[in-house]
Swiss-Prot record:
It comes from the Bacteria. A motif ('HIGH' region) lies at residues 34-44. Keywords: Aminoacyl-tRNA synthetase, ATP-binding, Cytoplasm, Ligase, Nucleotide-binding, Protein biosynthesis. Coiled coil: none annotated. It holds the Pfam family tRNA-synt_1c_C2. This is Glutamine--tRNA ligase. Its EC number is 6.1.1.18. ATP binds at residues 35-37, 41-47, 231, 261-262, 269-271. SUPFAM superfamilies: Nucleotidylyl transferase (SSF52374), Ribosomal protein L25-like (SSF50715). The gene is glnS. Signal peptide: none annotated. Its main location: cytoplasm. GO terms for cellular component: cytosol. The lineage of its organism: Bacteria, Pseudomonadati, Pseudomonadota, Gammaproteobacteria, Alteromonadales.
């Protein structure tokens, strides 16, 4: 077992500790069982970190198992995307990838065993009749007229289902449990249905497919899972989980434990609603950096370490709560503050001309990549007579709180000299286009000899050697903390969730930027090169997160 002092603790780990101490289990085997019908989101990241993290900490194993029992909605592309997400988060699964479809023969055998024991029957009620017979939370169900069909006839009917002799929706195999149970999941649930659909793993071998609640527990048993961990919406289903395990001849007896799912402010987690965002072109794709998918966070510049830290901070409980977005943003902000190299980018450029700087002079300034981490080394930043600075970093007049460039006031250019503004040019609309200044050539890396110290520092890029870039300022997709509660969540989409800047200027070192690798743009925030640039050679940077939480003030 790894160092227990650094392990997180929660009620699930307490259960595992007790199971190991008592000898109930001699090792730990968990699993992460996504359905390959879409992209994983940050809620899945929590489950990945929990299941794989437990296996790591207890020197156990965690299986990656695809719950692929619904072929009409599944795709091999999602299988590949999910594998990429798990690996990106820093985890490896035990052995080969598992598929529920690997067990279709065994699952069919278990269904036959239930029929032979008089615990399953083929039912010909249609969907509407099935709902009517099922009852409600306040009204018990009633038995299907097909419930007492003989074992022999049910075996023959199930064989006909398997052989494709019934059309879809005509019949289904149901477990015979208790139609008066207070738990709806025990009112003779469907465990097999007819589907003439091509399967991405088994092809056209099967035309009957098992339901999730039947497949899940038996797959756990076949794989020797010791602790089957899922979210609270499956709490009642645990009774069906246990019933199935008790009724058939399985090689092991797993147990299910539930924890609260992740609810995150300003975010939707419903796959159906996320699909609506994509289908209605409210976002560009499933990996649009405003989406809560793992692929979107990766594209936005989030790091695996920040996601794992987030999962650690929010913990594992049975209590439903909503996590503030600031918790997630703090995790990535802290990670990148410590590890991201610095660079300079001017998003709204105006020209700065140093009038006393020689026309033919060009310098290669050596600038640290990180102010407190010498191991990150240095880079060369070109400097000459003409630079670009941010338009908001200059005013003709300003109060004492404004610590940037003002006429007759001095500031330091980051990593370079102290300059003093003298005058400016404006266009016909009165917008400043060019600022003129003088520089003190003795101030490279040091303060003026007269003892004065500039009160401000601004960033800049060389006007002649800077690179053109597109910068996408991503923000929260919704304007309200709980968009799912809105009558129409389209009405609460943040119109400023994406602001695209096409005229940005960046320092030349960023020509070597790699997709998804984040930089701190000095005084701006954290940005990474997009991983889906349509035009070869173009520089498109996505904002990962700002330097500080601007929403904290908005919400006050």
């Amino acid at each position: 077992m790894s160092d227990t002092e650094n392990r997180p603790t929660n009620f699930i780990r307490n259960i595992i500790d007790a199971d190991l101490d008592s000898g109930k289990h001699t090792g730990v085997q968990t699993r992460f069982p996504p359905e390959p019908n879409g992209f994983l989101h940050i809620g899945h990241a929590k489950a990945i970190c929990l299941n794989f993290g437990i296996a790591q900490d207890y020197n156990g194993l965690c299986n990656l198992r695809f719950d692929d029992t619904n072929p009409e909605k599944e795709d091999i592309d999602y299988v590949h995307a999910i594998q990429k997400d798990v690996k990106w988060l820093g985890f490896e699964w035990a052995g080969e990838i598992h598929y529920s479809s690997n067990y279709f023969d065994q699952l069919h055998g278990f269904a036959v065993e239930l029929i032979e024991k008089g615990l399953a029957y083929v039912c010909f009620l249609n969907a509407e009749e099935t709902r009517e017979y099922r009852g409600t939370l306040n009204k018990p169900g009633k038995n299907s007229p097909y419930r007492d069909t003989s074992v022999e006839e049910n075996l023959a009917l199930f064989a006909k289902m398997k052989n494709g002799e019934f059309e879809e929706g005509i019949c289904a195999l149901r477990a015979k449990i208790d139609m008066t149970s207070s738990f709806m999941c025990l009112r003779d649930p469907i465990i097999y249905r007819v589907r003439f659909a091509h399967h991405h793993q088994t092809g056209d071998k099967w035309c009957i497919y098992p339901m999730y609640d039947f497949t899940h527990c038996l797959s756990d048993a076949l794989e020797g899972i010791t602790h089957s961990i899922c979210t609270l919406e499956f709490q009642d289903n645990r009774r069906l989980y246990d019933w199935v395990i008790e009724q058939v001849s399985v090689p092991s007896t797993p147990h299910q434990y539930e924890f609260s799912r992740l609810n995150l402010e300003y975010t939707l987690m419903s796959k159906r609603k996320l699909n609506t965002l994509v289908e209605e072109k409210l976002v560009d794709s499933w990996d649009d950096p405003r989406m809560p998918t793992i692929a979107a966070f990766r594209r936005r510049g989030y790091t695996p370490a920040s996601m794992r830290e987030f999962a650690k901070r929010i913990g594992v409980t049975k209590m439903e709560n909503t996590i503030e977005m600031s918790v997630l943003e703090a995790c990535i902000r802290e990670d990148l503050n410590d590890n991201a190299p610095r660079a300079m980018a001017v998003l709204d450029p105006i020209k700065l001309v140093i009038e006393n700087y020689p026309e033919d002079k060009n310098e290669d300034l050596i600038v640290k990549n990180h102010p407190s981490d010498d191991e990150q080394g240095t880079r060369i930043v070109p400097f000459s007579k003409e630079l670009y600075i941010e338009a908001e970093d200059f005013r003709e007049e300003a109060n004492k709180k404004y610590k940037r460039l003002v006429i007759d006031k001095a500031v330091r250019l980051r990593g370079a000299y102290v300059v003093t503004a003298t005058r400016c040019d404006k266009d016909e609309q009165g917008n400043v286009t060019t600022v003129y200044c003088t520089y003190n050539e003795d101030t490279l890396g040091k303060n003026p000899t007269d003892g004065t110290k500039p009160k401000g520092v601004i960033h800049w890029v060389d006007a002649n050697k800077s690179l053109d870039a597109i910068v996408r300022l991503y923000d929260r997709l919704f304007t309200v903390p709980n968009p799912a509660a809105a009558d129409d969540f389209n009405s609460v989409i943040n119109p400023q969730s994406l602001v695209t800047i096409t005229g940005a200027k960046v320092e030349p070192s960023l020509a070597e930027a790699k997709p998804e690798f984040a930089y701190q743009f000095e005084r701006q925030g954290y940005f990474c090169l997009d991983n889906d640039i349509k035009e070869p050679g173009a520089l498109v940077f996505n904002r990962t997160v700002g330097l500080r939480d601007t929403w904290a003030k908005i919400s006050q």
